Structures are given as structure tokens and as C-alpha cells.
């Protein structure tokens, strides 16, 4: 065949592909929400900024409204933007959109655990996990004592910095890591423990990689990209290593299990596995238990650690806020008493600051992907089963009608005219509905108590002028990743 013939054949193929794509789009989208026209193979990839997909969603919402459709490759995605649409999907249609959209980088977790799972296995595992965590003190006195005990170790580690500059990533991260480790395994790590540091390093690296443009691309075009070199290989290697660690700990627990005296969360899951010993379709397999534990270890460590780390940077940017916090802590708690969760009721400013930190950093801007579990009539549209559904949390947390000047850090967003704490129904940092964060109660408690303990004993000192601190995230994707920085903590007794 001549070069001209090849060129003509290629053009005919491309035109045919385009016509087929147009026909499919018209045929399948007549009852879908509106959205930009997708190209063959790539969909709407060229209309999205892979380094800031949440911003792209906001721009598309301005054109197409609060409910719109985009395609990433052949993957159909319905995006919900704004408080009303997001709340409607998460709370009023919580069954119809309770599925978890596929995330190829977490393939090793597919059909297991409490985050990336679907169907009966997910429902039973999640329900049992919530009940068991309550029994082990989730959000109650048992966990308060855990956090207070860990705050002591955190303060000791901070004192050992002797006022010198340090990177807070792993030092601060050890505190929530140890809290969740105690719940899962009844294990406490030294702050220099190599295993703990390795785990936190992988958690931290995964959080960053998941937020890069390449992983956004990979998760939507994995069929084409899986055999290429790239950071997806490192991410999946880390995920497998974390799962292997969890499986090893689960097997250790199995070999020393005393059913009459469960030690921790892992023991209770193993006891359920024993009950299903003769079941033809057991839910609590070793693999499912290991992935459940790995899910909770990763989420329970990295999200709280990142929020604390971002929060300290924000307080250095706004020293007047830190000064008000010191005043409230001194007045309510004093220099010696351990902060308690009951203090939250009489410390509206700290409560407001903790909420505003979470709102401002908007840690998981696009939520985790949901999925339609059945063909669903939603407003004037039909959303087919299997459609990925994204209820954007940033559109709620940055709603200018609820939070005036949302791009500014203002604790007053959560204070009324009398200086009392003001709850907002727009505060959806943990999502809502059937996929709400399992560890919400624990995370809220940790953020309040750890922040109170740190500021009770230390002043924060930036290495640069506060006005030169840049709060912009270094990556925006799965999460918003804070910039790297160092700080000094100065014992307040020396001030």
C-alpha cells in the first residue's frame, strides 16, 4: 500500500471512530446531565487540568450548572458541585450512590476493606468495624485517654528538638500513627522506630503520589498506561508493602488469639473469621481483615498528620491567631492540666480554629469517587448504574454564601457575634452519608487535643517572616498536599 493509501485509510478510520463516538454520545447521553462533548478514546481529558482537577470542575460548573457529565476516556463521570447538589446525593440518595468508584492504583484492595470495597462485603465489614470501634472507645473516654497519653510522648519529642529547626512531617505524624496503631494492634512505636518511620514514609509518599497529575491520568487510563514506567509502580509497590505489613500483624494476632479476651480491633475481626470457619462464602478472610486494617492505618495516620502539619503552618502565618489560642488555653486549662475533650465546650476559639483549618485546607477536595449502584432518577436526569459520581467537597467548604471570603483563613467563619462556636452544616470535611469517614470521631478528638497540648506548652516560630509563608499546596489531586517546611517550637516557660 502506498503512503497516500495508508494516509487515506488512517483518516477514514479516524473519521469513522469520531462518527461512532458522536452516535454513542447522542444515543447514551440524552437523559444524562449536560457537559462538554467527549473526544474518542480520551474523552474530556483536554478540558481538565490534571494538576488541579477540582479547579477544572469549578469552571465546568459555572458553564453547565451544579450537575454535569464529563468523560475521562470511556469512563462516564457525573460531578455534583455546590452544597445543595452534594447534600442531595450524599444524604437523600445515599443508597443509590453508595458504591465506590474504581481506583486502579488500589487494585490490591479491590473487593476488600472499608474504603475501596463495594457490595455486601463492604457493608458488613463497615458495619462491624463501626460497632467494634465504638466498643474500643471511638469518640469516647477510651480514645480520649489514648490521645492524652500519646500527647505526653509527642510533647517529649518536641522538647528534644531544643528549640532548633525541624521538619514536622514524621515527628508530628507519630502521634496519630500511634493512636490508630494502639486501636488496631495494641502497639506503641518509639518516635525513632524504623518500622514506624518506614510506614509513615510510605503513607506520606502515597498521599503525595495520589495527588499528582500522572496518577490522575493513570487512574482513568490504566488499561493503556499500566505497562509503562511511572510513579504508579512506586505507589502500588507501597500499597502492597503496607498490606503485607498488616497481613503479618494479623497473622501474629491469629497465632496468639484468646477469644475470651480480645486485645484490640484486629482480635475482634479474627473472632468473626473463626465464626465463619465453615461458611461457603466467608466475609472475614485473612485478606479482607488485612486490607481493612491497612485502610484504617493509612487513613487514620496520614489525614490527621497532614491536617496537623498544615495547621501549624497556618498558625505561623497568622501569629495573632496563635496568640488568641494561647490566651484561651491559659485561661481555661492553665499550664499543667492535661487538655480534655470536655474543654471543647468552653474553648470556642480553639474549636473554631480547628474547624477553619480543616475547611481552609480542603484536604480531600473532590471526595473519593462514588458509584451509582442502580439506574437512578436524579432531578431531571437518569444516571445509569456504574456511573462514577463525584460529590465535590471543595464546592461546599468554599461556598462564599456560607463562608464569606472563603479563600481567606478566618476562624470567624465558625464563631457567632458573641464569640461562641457556630456549627455549619456546610462543614463536610469528612464527607457524609454511607461513605462518611469511619474515623471522623477519632480525628476530631485528635485534632483538638493534640493542637491544645502543643500550644499549651510551646510557641511556634517560623524560619521566615510570617508574611512570606506560602500556604499554597504543592500538589492538588486526591488530596491537597502542604508545602514542606521547618519550624522551631519554643517552650513557653522560656518566654
UniProtKB/Swiss-Prot annotation:
Its cofactor is heme. Its EC number is 1.14.14.1, 1.14.13.n7. Substrate binds at residues 298-303. Pathway: Lipid metabolism; fatty acid metabolism. SUPFAM superfamilies: Cytochrome P450 (SSF48264). The keyword Iron applies. It is a peripheral membrane protein. It is an enzyme of class 1 (oxidoreductase). GO terms for molecular function: arachidonate epoxygenase activity; heme binding; Hsp70 protein binding; Hsp90 protein binding; iron ion binding; oxidoreductase activity, acting on paired donors, with incorporation or reduction of molecular oxygen, reduced flavin or flavoprotein as one donor, and incorporation of one atom of oxygen. A cytochrome P450 monooxygenase involved in the metabolism of fatty acids. Mechanistically, uses molecular oxygen inserting one oxygen atom into a substrate, and reducing the second into a water molecule, with two electrons provided by NADPH via cytochrome P450 reductase (NADPH--hemoprotein reductase). Catalyzes the hydroxylation of carbon-hydrogen bonds. Hydroxylates fatty acids specifically at the omega-1 position displaying the highest catalytic activity for saturated fatty acids. May be involved in the oxidative metabolism of xenobiotics. This is Cytochrome P450 2E1.
Amino acid at each position: 500500500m502506498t503512503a497516500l493509501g495508508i494516509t487515506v485509510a488512517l483518516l477514514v478510520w479516524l473519521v469513522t471512530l469520531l462518527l461512532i463516538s458522536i452516535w454513542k454520545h447522542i444515543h447514551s447521553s440524552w437523559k444524562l446531565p449536560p457537559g462538554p462533548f467527549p473526544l474518542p478514546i480520551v474523552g474530556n481529558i483536554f478540558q481538565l487540568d490534571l494538576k488541579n482537577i477540582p479547579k477544572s470542575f469549578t469552571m465546568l460548573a459555572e458553564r453547565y450548572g451544579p450537575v454535569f457529565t464529563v468523560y475521562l476516556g470511556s469512563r462516564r463521570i457525573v460531578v455534583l458541585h455546590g452544597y445543595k447538589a452534594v447534600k442531595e446525593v450524599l444524604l437523600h440518595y445515599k443508597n443509590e450512590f453508595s458504591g465506590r468508584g474504581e481506583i486502579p492504583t488500589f487494585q490490591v484492595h479491590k473487593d476488600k476493606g472499608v474504603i475501596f470495597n463495594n457490595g455486601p462485603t463492604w457493608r458488613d465489614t463497615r458495619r462491624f468495624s463501626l460497632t467494634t470501634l465504638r466498643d474500643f472507645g471511638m469518640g469516647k473516654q477510651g480514645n480520649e485517654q489514648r490521645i492524652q497519653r500519646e500527647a505526653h510522648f509527642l510533647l517529649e519529642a518536641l522538647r528534644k528538638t531544643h528549640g532548633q529547626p525541624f521538619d514536622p512531617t514524621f515527628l508530628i505524624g507519630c502521634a496519630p500513627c500511634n493512636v490508630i496503631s494502639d486501636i488496631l494492634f495494641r502497639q506503641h512505636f518509639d518516635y525513632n522506630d524504623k518500622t514506624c518511620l518506614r510506614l509513615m514514609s510510605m503513607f506520606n509518599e502515597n498521599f503525595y503520589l495520589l495527588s499528582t497529575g500522572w496518577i490522575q491520568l493513570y487512574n482513568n487510563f490504566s488499561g493503556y498506561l499500566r505497562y509503562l514506567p511511572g510513579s504508579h509502580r512506586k505507589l502500588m509497590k507501597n500499597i502492597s508493602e503496607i498490606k503485607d505489613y498488616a497481613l503479618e500483624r494479623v497473622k501474629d494476632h491469629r497465632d496468639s488469639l484468646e477469644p475470651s479476651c480480645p486485645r484490640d480491633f484486629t482480635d475482634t475481626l479474627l473472632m468473626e473469621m473463626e465464626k465463619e470457619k465453615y461458611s461457603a462464602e466467608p466475609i472475614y478472610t485473612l485478606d479482607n481483615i488485612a486490607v481493612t486494617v491497612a485502610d484504617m492505618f493509612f487513613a487514620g495516620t496520614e489525614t490527621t498528620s497532614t491536617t496537623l502539619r498544615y495547621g501549624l503552618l497556618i498558625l505561623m502565618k497568622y501569629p495573632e491567631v496563635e496568640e488568641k489560642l494561647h490566651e484561651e488555653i491559659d485561661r481555661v486549662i492553665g499550664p499543667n492540666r492535661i487538655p480534655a475533650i470536655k474543654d471543647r465546650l468552653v474553648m470556642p476559639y480553639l474549636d473554631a480554629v480547628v474547624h477553619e483549618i480543616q475547611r481552609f485546607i480542603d484536604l480531600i477536595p473532590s471526595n473519593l469517587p462514588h458509584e451509582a449502584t442502580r439506574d437512578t432518577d436524579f432531578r431531571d436526569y437518569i444516571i445509569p448504574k456504574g456511573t462514577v459520581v463525584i460529590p465535590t467537597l471543595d464546592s461546599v467548604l468554599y461556598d462564599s454564601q456560607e463562608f464569606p471570603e472563603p479563600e481567606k483563613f478566618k476562624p470567624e467563619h465558625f464563631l457567632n457575634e458573641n464569640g461562641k462556636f457556630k456549627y455549619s452544616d456546610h462543614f463536610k470535611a469528612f464527607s457524609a452519608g454511607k461513605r462518611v469517614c469511619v474515623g471522623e470521631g477519632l480525628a476530631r478528638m485528635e485534632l483538638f487535643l493534640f493542637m491544645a497540648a502543643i500550644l499549651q506548652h510551646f510557641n511556634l516560630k517560623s524560619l521566615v517572616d510570617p508574611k512570606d509563608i506560602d500556604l499554597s499546596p504543592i500538589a492538588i489531586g486526591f488530596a491537597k498536599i502542604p508545602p514542606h517546611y521547618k519550624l522551631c517550637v519554643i517552650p513557653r516557660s522560656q518566654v
